[in-house]
């Protein structure tokens, strides 16, 4: 039994020890990650870790390889960023310490990835060799290798490039095979991957998206007009073709850059999407996928991104009109602002509740932050050749 006279000193000592044990180390600030994000700096193979509350760069992480078409996903706790390099490198970056905790060279050429619903697995889409590899999200140890095989017209077994890889509810992954014209659905609930193939979906699927509720997977087709839709609530129904006129059409217009399907916007019962090769944003009915309207815009749109409250849509454009961002009011369908953030605008990202929009201008070496209410610039960050911008709220959103 502790004597009464010793209780207060011992309690004070215990409290001091507890506080000391909880203090942040000099290299790791004790803080949350909900307002953090990263900017890909493609020329230097680095990430800029940013604070969206203070609108500043906190740290830079180097040694990430070829980031010319890099994408980023986040761990379930939003502390770690998984960086998918074009050179096949997969890196796990600690946003708080600014360190690479793990890195593997898992293929010769990769094009993105996804994190499973339970956060335990990281999947990587590979061009070379074509397929999907799965890794433990804490150690980056390989868990499974799923070759993207198909039979060509001569009956020979080939491997296809994998595109449009996303996570789906039920601890599943969905992706498309470019050369094969297939969609594959992988269930990871058992000891081994369970693969379902959907064939003859259309020619050369080049990108895909999954809706915010995880029900519909939509693949864009490079080799023909139209889109391929898979209802993940009823996969047994197979793939449905929608928007048959979506594409380059009979008049094969020059396309400076194929629009990203991730840049589509689902706002209420409407889908807002970039036209291919035309200076238009298209509006489709999200129930029957009929085309409702065409809005003329500044150039060939790449990303058509909604503010989280769905009141605004922000649009950037392909070369040579890629120094402009236009803002559209979704109610009036009018362009309410034409912004000039800098040369070669590549990406846009909203803060979680939409009060800010961050825009990367690669050839101007800067990221510009806008107030989405006033549409005024509120900050400018120096960044060498910035491209993709990714905020940690993506950790808790399907397909992002």
Predicted regions and their residues:
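Bacterial N-terminal signal peptides that target proteins for export
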Residues: 2-11
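Bacterial N-terminal signal peptides
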Residues: 11-20
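Predominantly soluble domains enriched in secretory-pathway, periplasmic, or organellar proteins
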Residues: 22-400
């Amino acid at each position: 039994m502790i004597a009464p006279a010793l209780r207060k000193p011992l309690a004070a000592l215990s409290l001091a020890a507890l506080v000391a044990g909880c203090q942040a180390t000099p290299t790791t600030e004790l803080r949350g990650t909900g307002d953090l994000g990263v900017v890909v700096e493609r020329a230097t193979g680095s990430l800029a870790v940013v604070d969206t509350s203070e609108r500043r760069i906190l740290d830079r992480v180097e040694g990430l390889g070829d980031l010319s078409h890099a994408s980023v996903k986040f761990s379930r706790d939003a502390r770690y960023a998984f960086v998918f390099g074009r050179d096949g490198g997969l890196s796990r970056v600690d946003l708080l310490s600014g360190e690479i905790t793990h890195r593997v060279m898992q293929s010769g050429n990769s094009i993105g990835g996804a994190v499973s619903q339970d956060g335990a697995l990281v999947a990587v889409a590979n061009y070379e060799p074509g397929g999907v590899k799965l890794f433990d999200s804490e150690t980056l140890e390989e868990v499974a290798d799923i070759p993207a095989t198909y039979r060509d017209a001569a009956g020979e077994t080939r491997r296809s490039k994998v595109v449009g890889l996303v996570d789906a509810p039920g601890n599943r992954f969905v992706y498309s095979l470019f050369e094969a014209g297939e969609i594959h659905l992988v269930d990871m609930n058992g000891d081994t991957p369970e693969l379902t193939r959907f064939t003859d979906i259309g020619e050369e699927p080049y990108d895909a998206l999954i809706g915010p509720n995880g029900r519909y997977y939509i693949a864009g087709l490079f080799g023909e007009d139209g889109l391929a839709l898979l209802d993940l609530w009823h996969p047994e129904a197979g793939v449905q073709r929608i928007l048959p006129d979506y594409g380059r059409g009979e008049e094969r217009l020059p396309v400076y850059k194929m629009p990203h399907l991730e840049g589509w916007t689902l706002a209420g019962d409407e889908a807002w999407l970039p036209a291919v090769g035309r200076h238009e944003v298209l509006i489709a009915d999200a129930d029957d996928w009929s085309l409702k309207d065409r809005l003329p815009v500044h150039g060939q749109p790449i990303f058509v991104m909604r503010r989280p409250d769905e009141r605004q849509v922000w649009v950037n454009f392909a070369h040579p009109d890629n120094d402009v961002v236009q803002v559209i009011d979704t109610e009036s369908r009018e362009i309410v602002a034409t912004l000039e953030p800098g040369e070669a605008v590549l990406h846009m990202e909203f803060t979680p509740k939409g009060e800010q929009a961050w825009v990367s201008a690669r050839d101007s070496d800067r990221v510009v932050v806008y107030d989405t209410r006033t549409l005024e610039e509120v900050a400018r960050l120096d960044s060498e050749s910035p491209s993709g911008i990714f905020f940690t709220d993506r950790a808790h959103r399907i397909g992002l």
